[in-house]
Swiss-Prot record:
Highest taxon above the source species: Bacteria
EC number(s) reported in the record: 1.7.99.1
Function: Catalyzes the reduction of hydroxylamine to form NH(3) and H(2)O.
Coiled coil regions, renumbered to chain: none
Descriptive protein name: Hydroxylamine reductase
The encoding gene: hcp
Subcellular location: Cytoplasm
Cofactor, how bound (note): Binds 1 [2Fe-2S] cluster. Binds 1 hybrid [4Fe-2O-2S] cluster.
Organism this protein belongs to: Shewanella loihica (strain ATCC BAA-1088 / PV-4)
Length: 554
């Protein structure tokens, strides 16, 4: 086992990364190794997909399968060895299909058949123990003895960034948003990463290409969500219990939430969102359901306590899932799509009757709690509608600075930094937030500036796209570059979606971003120095020190 993809990975003087019997996320060594083997086989699939495309051979099912299966290896997504092995076998079959098509096309046109990356020729075993034996050559740090740490760090930056982009590609696909050019670029990068390049310049350029790719994917996802559910609107959301039977929907999948709402109509079941599903309550086509009654709980890392206390059924539509046996709710949590946990019921297809039956069999909430509301829904359309008022308040001096404080949440005590910097931001500043990092402060009262709320909840992590659009609009109005705006980005990271959003921002030329609570363990001091010199990227320090630097206070 070797895994270094998330913020909670082991860090010691002897080296970084989880490499023992179990990772810090709870992932067993065997599961980690099987995931690495899956990725390796997927790289082989992409290698043949890229070559086959040159002959006009495109298989849409494969184009969507590869990022979906890659998503299954994200932090806190799928811990089920049997499911991971099934993905690997399916990938192996797809590789054979593309290989045959490619070689046939070469012969038909009199072209030489190329020898591709090693992952394109690995013979897969069918027995778990034999698959685990193969995994040694698929580890993400393979060949570490032959390359320096900087090259390895760049490889991992690209691998984990592309993994984040794959997750967003799958979210977009669920909403019928696919793009053949995006798929082609994805396969190209996936195959390149399978080549174990030692070219630092090429690897760095690839990291920027991944950021550009993800910018397009975020636009696709934004289009898919707004076409399906309308544009988010500023909305008051209840955050406490409502009497009655209940279902809790966590993850990121709005389509699954819609299906659950449709299938629970008239059944006397209240539906709550959790974690990154909170923004769903601002979409017109979702909030129209009266039994979508609010958001329960907070960010992913608190789920073992929150799900244990929730008196209903729970559906995990995507990341992040952690051990449901700790809170003794494994018999009433259900997984969907790429999510998996051994022994937990997995919903295949679009029939949620098992979830509904479980909810009806449970006690539900006994009484209504005193209502407490927060305001959400300041995504792209709402931000653009507010832009003229924002511009006027900037011009008259009422608004002097903008902060984007958000990203991933997590357990570390140091993450209180993000609460503290939001609270300490000057009263003449606007605070935008997104991702589950918002839970560090989204129930606090920040007031308003001439009717404009100081705290603007933009949405999920992928809604960084909305913040980018606002920044572009403001830069056009004020006839300046984005980096010249009074805008500061303070981002918390935990896993691979956050990595690709960072790459997206860097690829767009956004500078002077602060990230925390710690730098990714796979980035060496040399790489961090390059990112600081090129982009002004830096780690968070103290709230006082960072605010003074941001606001140019001596």
């Amino acid at each position: 086992m070797f895994c270094i993809q998330c913020e909670q990975t082991i860090r010691t003087p002897a080296g970084n990364g989880c490499s023992y019997s179990q990772g810090m996320c709870g992932k067993l060594a065997a599961t980690s190794d099987l995931q690495d083997l899956l990725i390796y086989i997927l790289q082989g699939v992409s290698a043949y997909a890229e070559k086959a495309r040159a002959f006009g051979i495109i298989v849409p099912a494969i184009d969507t399968f590869v990022p979906k299966a890659f998503f299954a290896t994200l932090t806190n997504v799928n811990f089920d060895d049997e499911r991971i092995m099934a993905y690997t076998q399916q990938a192996y079959g797809y590789r054979a299909q593309l290989q045959a098509a490619y070689e046939s096309a070469c012969k038909a046109q009199g072209q030489a058949i190329e020898t591709l990356i090693p992952a394109a020729s690995l013979v897969l075993a069918s027995v778990k123990e034999e698959m685990l034996a193969l995994a040694a050559q698929a580890l993400p740090n393979r060949g570490k003895e032959e390359v320096n740490e900087d090259i390895m760090g760049l490889r991992l930056l690209c691998l984990y960034g592309l993994k984040g982009a794959a997750a967003y590609m799958e979210h977009a696909r669920v909403l019928d948003q696919t793009d053949s050019e995006v798929a082609a670029k994805f396969h190209e990068i996936m195959a390149f990463l399978g080549s174990d390049s030692v070219d630092a310049d090429k690897l760095f350029a690839t990291a920027m290409e991944i950021g550009q790719l993800n910018y397009r994917v975020m636009a696709m996802l934004d289009e898919g969500e707004t076409q399906a559910f309308g544009h988010p609107e500023p909305t008051q959301v209840n955050t406490v219990a409502v009497k009655g039977k209940a279902i809790l929907v966590s993850g990121h999948d709005m389509k699954d939430l819609e299906l659950i709402l449709q299938q629970t109509e008239g059944k006397g079941i209240n539906v709550f969102t959790h974690g990154e599903m909170l923004p769903a309550l601002a979409y017109p086509e979702l909030k129209k359901y009266p039994h979508l009654v609010g958001n329960y709980g907070s960010a992913w890392q608190n789920q073992q306590k929150e799900f244990a206390n929730f008196p209903g059924a729970v559906v995990m539509t995507s990341n992040c899932i952690i051990d449901p046996n700790v809170g003794d709710y494994a018999d009433r949590i259900f997984t969907r799509s790429i999510v998996g946990w051994p022994g937990v019921t997995h919903i295949v297809g679009d029939d949620f009757s098992a979830v509904i039956d479980k909810a009806l069999s449970l006690e539900g909430f006994a009484y209504d709690e005193i209502p407490h509301h927060i305001t959400i829904g300041f995504a792209r359309n709402a931000l653009m509608a507010a832009a003229p008022a924002v511009v006027e308040n900037v011009k008259n001096g009422s608004i002097k600075h903008f902060f984007l404080v958000g990203g991933c949440d997590g357990d570390k005590a140091e993450r209180s930094y993000f609460t503290d910097i939001a609270k300490a931001a000057p009263k003449d500043s606007i605070i935008m937030t997104l991702g589950c990092g918002k839970y560090k402060f989204n129930k606090l009262a920040f007031g308003d500036i001439n009717g404009i709320p100081r705290l603007l909840d933009i949405g999920q992590c992928n809604d960084a796209y909305s913040a980018i659009q606002l920044a572009i609009a403001l830069s056009e109005v004020f006839e300046c570059e984005i980096n010249e705006l009074p805008l500061s980005l303070v981002l918390s990271w935990f896993e691979q979606k956050a990595i690709v959003i960072l790459l997206t921002l860097l690829s767009l030329g956004v500078k002077n971003i602060r990230t925390g609570p710690s730098a990714p363990a796979f980035l060496t001091p040399n790489l961090l120095k390059v990112l600081e010199d090129k982009f002004g990227l830096r780690s968070t320090t103290t709230v006082e020190q960072d605010l003074n630097a941001i606001l140019n206070v001596a």
